[in-house]
Each structure stands twice: as C-alpha cells, then as structure tokens.
Swiss-Prot record:
NCBIfam families for this protein: PRK11028.1 (NF008258)
Source species: Buchnera aphidicola subsp. Schizaphis graminum (strain Sg)
Name by which UniProt lists this protein: 6-phosphogluconolactonase
Free-text function comment from the UniProt entry: Catalyzes the hydrolysis of 6-phosphogluconolactone to 6-phosphogluconate.
Gene3D superfamilies from the UniProt entry: YVTN repeat-like/Quinoprotein amine dehydrogenase
C-alpha cells in the first residue's frame, strides 16, 4: 500500500501529487494545472475520485485517481458561489459544497460515474458558511456559520434534501467564528475550531425519544493559560484512534496538541508547536504516523513524526510547494 498526498496551491493554480514513504520522506510525482484558484479538495475512496473546488468561475472539477495516485481530469460542474469546503454523505451519493462568500450550502447528487449533477437544493442566508460535515450515525449535516457564531443542523432525507432538525442550530460563544468541524470516531462527539477567538468547542451528540440533541460540554483555548491579542485559527484534525487532537492557527503560526479524555471525550491542552508561516491546513496520514502542515505564506510543507504514546510531534522533513497552498489531503492506494 502506498500513501499519496494531494496539495491544492491557489496562487499557482495547481494540484500537487506527492508520495509519502514509510520513513516520512516525500516525493513530488505530478503537478496538475487547474485553470483557476483551487481551494478545497476531497476524495471518495471507493470510486477513487478527487473533487476540487475552483474559483472565480465557481466550479468543482472531478479527477480520476489511477493506480499510482496520479490525477486525470474527468469533468467540470457548476456550483453556486465560491467553493470553500466539499464533503459527502455516508452513502457517497450527494456532494455538499459550502460557500463562505455566497452564504450558502448546496446539495448536488452524484451520477453513476461520480460526477456532480446540478444542485437539487441551495440553502441561503447561512452567513459565513465555511464548512459542512456529515455525521453518519445520526444522519445529520453540521454546517458552520462563522459570521453568526452558530452551527446549523440538518437531517438528510432519502432523496438528498436537507431538513432542519428539531434543534435547528447551536450557538458558540459570541465573536468566536466556528470554522471547521470534525467528529470523534464513535460519532457521539463533535469538535469545532473557532477562528476568531482561538478556541475549540466540544459537543455531545445524542438522541432522546428520536429527537436529536447537540450540547456544548467544553470550550478550551489553543494556548492553555496564555493569551494572544489576536487569533486566526484554521484547521482541526483528530487521529483515527481518537486519542490526539490537533489545531492550527495562522496568526500564531502554530499547531496545538490536545489529549482526548477517554471517559468523556473532552480535551486537555498538552503542547504547542511553532510551524510553517500561516498554516492554513494540515492532514494526518492514514496510519497516524505523520502530520503534514502546509504554510500558505512560506510555500512549504513540514512533515512531523507522531509519537504513538503521547501524540507529540517531531519535525523530520520540509519541502517546497507551489504558491499559496490552501488544502491538503491523503489517500491510500
């Protein structure tokens, strides 16, 4: 099995394809021009398709991933508004595209070849709609509204139409700016990074008498007891074992490591690491061995070895990327 890392470079208008070797070394094997600023990229594993959001023409380009991890363009599809985040439902029949600038989320069915059709639903007035992530256990789409300090909650119907849950939405702290959302492997807890106040919210998800309840159980700062005059937090990821959570901040140029409490899934600050300049995104490889950070300003990536016992990071490699790297994801072939 070979691990492939894909990096979206907005200013260079391309996607880079890298091999990640078992020892943490990397090698660039392909650069694909995107004819526009590429931002979010997301992969459906079963069909080996990569989807890339392109601006300013507001498109999603579908690429086929071959046996070596290389990309071949298949089709372009139109989406409403500048794409900021691409995700899918658990059956991988529907594509969700968030648009921060258009304040909307769209739902596009995928045809038999995995190509997005025209949207069947567009929900407007989600101010600062930054990300959407599907919880398969509860059949709920979590949609972050950065400008309104809230997360909208929608059930997904059989035909792909989103319907408000009984709770409709949950609020984060005022002027916090919820940006990205992830789920614990057990799907009963969600973690959101707040861009504007440099914090993480932990949410407990449950159902009582078939009614969904999402409840905030913790808010914790990225710097523990230290205080910064400004925050610009960006990305959040959890190891697949559910033990270690990492959060990046572009103003602090840092990665914060938290330990996940196995009893209640709250998090405990452990350590902060200085990293690439303006670390907009990072990913954890499929084996939880490496964390790879891209610097939007440094135009470089750093590879960190993850300690399996503590989650601590040790920098082992650094490479030059294209200009303005905004997104990174991994794939196992």
């Amino acid at each position: 099995m070979q691990q492939i890392i894909y990096i979206a470079n907005a200013e260079s208008e391309n996607i880079e394809v890298w091999i990640l070797y078992n020892n943490g070394d990397m090698k660039l094997i392909q650069t694909v021009q995107t004819d526009g600023q590429v931002q979010p990229i997301s992969i459906i594993k079963n069909t080996k398709l990569l989807y890339a959001g392109i601006r300013p023409k507001n498109r999603v380009i579908t690429y086929q991933i071959d046996k070596n991890g290389l990309l071949k363009k298949k089709k372009e599809s139109i989406v409403p508004g500048t794409p900021n985040y691409i995700s899918f439902d658990s059956s991988e029949k529907f594509l969700f595209c968030s648009s921060y600038h258009a304040d909307c989320i769209s739902v596009s069915p995928l045809d038999k070849n995995g190509i997005p059709k025209d949207p069947i639903q567009i929900i407007h007035n989600i101010e600062g709609c930054h990300a959407a992530k599907f919880n398969s256990k509860y059949n709920v789409l979590f949609i972050t509204s950065l400008k309104n300090d809230c997360i909208y909650l929608y059930y997904l119907t059989h035909f792909g139409i989103l319907k408000s849950t009984e709770q409709k939405l949950v609020f984060s702290q005022k002027n916090s700016g919820p940006r990205h959302v992830i789920f614990h492997p057990n799907q009963n807890f969600s973690y959101t990074v707040n861009e504007l106040n440099g914090s993480v919210d932990v949410w407990k998800i449950s159902k009582e008498n078939k009614v969904l309840e999402v409840k905030n159980i913790q808010n914790i700062k990225l710097l523990n007891d230290l205080i910064s005059k400004k925050y610009w937090s960006s990305d959040i990821h959890l190891t697949s074992c559910g033990n270690f959570l990492y959060v990046s901040d572009r103003y602090l140029n840092s990665i914060s490591l938290f330990h996940v409490n196995k009893n209640d899934n709250t998090i405990i600050f452990f350590k902060q690491y200085l990293t690439e300049e303006q670390p907009r995104a990072f990913c954890i490889d499929r084996n939880n061995n490496y964390l790879i950070v891209i610097g939007q300003k440094s135009n470089k990536l750093s590879v960190y070895k993850i300690c399996q016992k503590t989650g601590e990071l040790k920098k082992i490699n650094q490479y030059q990327t294209g200009n303005g790297p905004l997104w990174i994801t991994s794939f196992l072939i």
